[in-house]
Amino acid sequence: MFKKILIANRGEIACRIIKTARKLGIKTVAICSDPDLNSPHVNLADEYFNIGGNTSAESYLIIEKIIDVLKKSNADA
C-alpha cells in the first residue's frame, strides 16, 4: 500500500481523494498555482507545493513541475 500520494488535481475531486486517503492512513501532497494557494485542497493536504503560475498552462499542465514535486516530496505515487 502507498504511504504518501501526490494529488495532481484541484478542487472538489482533490478534496475527495484527500479525505479518502486520510481514512486509509495515506499521507497526501497537493500541488497548487499561485491563485490556488488558499484553496480547500491545499488546506486539507498533509503537505503542499506551490508550482507557481497564474493559469493552468503555466502550472498544472507542465508535467515537469509535477514530476519535480513528486521527487521532492518522496511520494510513492
Regions found by a protein language model. Give the residues of each.
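ATP-binding N-terminal substructure of ATP-dependent carboxylate-amine bond-forming enzymes
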Residues: 1-77
